[in-house]
């Protein structure tokens, strides 16, 4: 199965953070799965690290190096991914989800027929079977 990992999932995995549950670690470690990261995550990390290096110690380059060293596959940003954001539908009465990085990565997963692994409750409120909530 193909899994696109949300940025925080990757950070937790790289740092050994216990917030990443065993089920998620097992999916990532399972060699029958293809593990992907988005170029969107590299952008998100670089923007957030540059703005607040005291809150996010990893920069985009180190993040990218970790992904490549582990053999994760990069998902580039395509026009189709961007334009499909308009088609995202929230569940009834779900509060707004304003994170543009998350929305773009969810669209990448949908367009590329992947599961989007996340811990974010707001992402799980989209009407799609692409979300793999951990």
Where are these regions (language model features)?
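Short, well-structured N-terminal submotif of metal-dependent ribonuclease cores
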Residues: 1-38, 53-65, 121, 125
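Acidic active-site catalytic centers that drive phospho-/nucleotidyl reactions
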Residues: 6, 44, 102, 120
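Generic structural signal for small/hydrophobic residues in well-ordered secondary structure
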Residues: 7-8, 45, 85, 109
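Residue-level signal for well-ordered alpha-helical positions
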Residues: 16-17, 48-51, 88, 129-130
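General small-molecule cofactor/ligand-binding pocket signal
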Residues: 36, 75, 132
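Active-site neighborhoods of divalent-metal-dependent phosphate/nucleic-acid chemistry enzymes
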Residues: 57, 69-119
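Charged phosphate-binding loop/patch that engages nucleotide di/tri-phosphates or the phosphate backbone
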Residues: 111, 115-117, 121-134
């Amino acid at each position: 199965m193909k899994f696109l990992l949300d940025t925080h999932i990757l950070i937790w995995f790289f740092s050994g953070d216990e917030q990443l549950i065993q089920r998620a670690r097992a999916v990532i470690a399972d060699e029958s799965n293809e593990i992907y990261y988005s170029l969107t995550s590299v952008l998100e990390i670089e923007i957030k690290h540059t703005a607040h290096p005291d809150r996010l110690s990893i920069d985009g380059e180190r993040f990218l190096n970790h992904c490549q060293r582990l053999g994760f596959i990069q998902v580039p940003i395509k026009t189709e991914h961007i334009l499909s954001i308009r088609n995202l539908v929230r569940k009834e009465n779900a509060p707004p989800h304003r994170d543009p990085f998350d929305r773009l990565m969810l669209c990448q997963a949908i367009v590329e027929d992947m599961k989007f692994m996340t811990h974010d409750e707001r992402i799980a409120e989209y009407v799609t079977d692409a979300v793999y909530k951990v």
